[in-house]
Each structure stands twice: as C-alpha cells, then as structure tokens.
Amino acid sequence: MKKMLGKLLITAGILVFFAVVVKDVFAAGLGFINGTEADSASASPRDIDSMVIESDSKDVRIIAEERSDISAGISGDSGKLFVTENKRKLELTVKEKEFQFLNGFNRSTLIVRLPYDYKGDLAVRTSSGDVSVAGNDHLALSGLNAVSASGNTSVTDVRIQDLKVKASSGDVSISNTVSKTAGIDLASGDANLVHVSGSLDVKMTSGDFNAVLKKVTGPVSVTLTSGDANVSLPQNGSFAVNALSASGDVSSPYSFADKGHKEQHHITGTQGSGRHPIDIKTDSGDLAIR
C-alpha cells in the first residue's frame, strides 16, 4: 500500500512538472508579441508623444528625473523586454521568461526613467503586478491611464491633465497630484488620496475611500457600494456637498458657511458660492466630511 501511494505521488509530481513545462513552452511559442526583444530601451522625449507599457506579472516602476532620454530596463532575471517605436509611440512589453518555476520567488521589475521634459501620454496595463509613478514634483503629463487586474497602484508628485486608474483587485494611492480630471474605478480595494487637486470621479464596489482634497476645481463624485468614506475638504473654496449613506452614519465636523441639511444618513452644506458639486454616496458604510 505504501509503495503504491509513493508511486502515485511520484506520478503526480511528474505530471505537475510537465504541465508547468508545457505551459511555459506554449506561452513562449504561441504568445504573439509586437516588438524586438532587448535588454534595455532608450528614446528621445522629442521623438515620443505617447508611451504604452504592458506587463503580465511584473511590477512597473516609473521614475521622473533630470535626464535627456527615456530609459527602460528590467531588474531581476525572470522577465523579458520587448520594444517597439513607431510613429512617435513607444511600446514596452514585459513577459515572463520560460521555466520560471525553477527560479523560485525571484521577481523582476520593469523600471522606466522619464526625463522631466516628457509631456506626452502614458498608459500602463498589468495583469498581476504593482504600478508606481513618481513624478518628483517635476513631471507633467497630458494623460496617465493605469489599468491593473491584480496589484496596487501608486501615483505621487505629478501634474496630469487627465488621470484614469482602473483595478479589479488592489489598493490605489495618489498623493501630491494635480489633475484637471481624475477617475478611479476600483472593484475591490481601498483608495487613499492625499493632497490631491482637481476634479474627481470615483466608483468603488468594495473598499474604503480616504481623501484629503487640497483644492477643488471641478465636480467631485464618489460612489461606493460597500465601504466607508472619509473626506477632508479644503478650508477655502466654492463647493456644495451632498453626502448620503443608505445604510450607515454620516457625520461632518466641517464648518460649512451654510449647512443646509443634517441628519443621521444625509448631510448637505455649502462653502463659498457652491460652484463645484461634491457628491459622496455609499450603499453600505459610514461617511465623514472633515
């Protein structure tokens, strides 16, 4: 009986081994990838208007710094980089190397270094990996679109005309960022915003929303299905707040110039001329306006 059990375990191990090998071989052989495989990439910001970064399971770090070129490379041994430059568009694709089950827990990261004078669009898509964009107070983009199936997203110290973040699972962190318009679409995870200025549209299914708004320059809409919201408003500005929880408490220690309505589940208030609407709603959760 023991010998038979041992043979079954050995057979199962062999089958798992070959299944992983076949998966890697088919992924490498059948996956069509645009671009040329390269150890690194470099381009002049004067020649590039838009960048597209795609990664399967690798983290992506984007760092702005004082430099003359756009540079990209992989840190670690488990990833492959493919590069395409065409019609003022730079595409960077990162894929898993074959037979990475032999590599243990070694995890690679795509590191992209942007010069401060790059002013174009940036799109980042990952199936499973974290995305971070660090502008170091000098990066100004016309657009940033980050999409992640599973992973955390972080954006810091950037000026952006249009910011879009979409994630199926993972936390979103945005700090010291100014945008004309910003949208967050999050299925599962928390969103934390600190010293953010601009217009905002947030849709979350399951997770908490925390925000410190530095300046409101357009409509702000926050809609949660299940989760708490804690929003800190600027002392100066012109906005009209409408906060509503279908099942939860709504509180506001904020001193509105005109507090129009206040009850357990619903608060309205106006600051200044009330030019910009701020609507915060949750189906299940507590709301706090500070």
Swiss-Prot record:
Coiled coil: none annotated. It comes from the Bacteria. Induction: Induced, via the two-component regulatory system LiaS/LiaR, by antibiotics (vancomycin, bacitracin, nisin and ramoplanin), cationic antimicrobial peptides (human LL-37 and porcine PG-1), Triton X-100 and severe secretion stress. Residues 1-27 form the signal peptide. Residues 276-290 have a biased composition (Basic and acidic residues). InterPro entries: Toastrack_DUF4097. Residues 257-290 are annotated as: Disordered. Keywords: Signal, Stress response. Disruption phenotype: Up-regulates expression of liaI which in turn induces the liaRS two-component regulatory system. This is Protein LiaG.
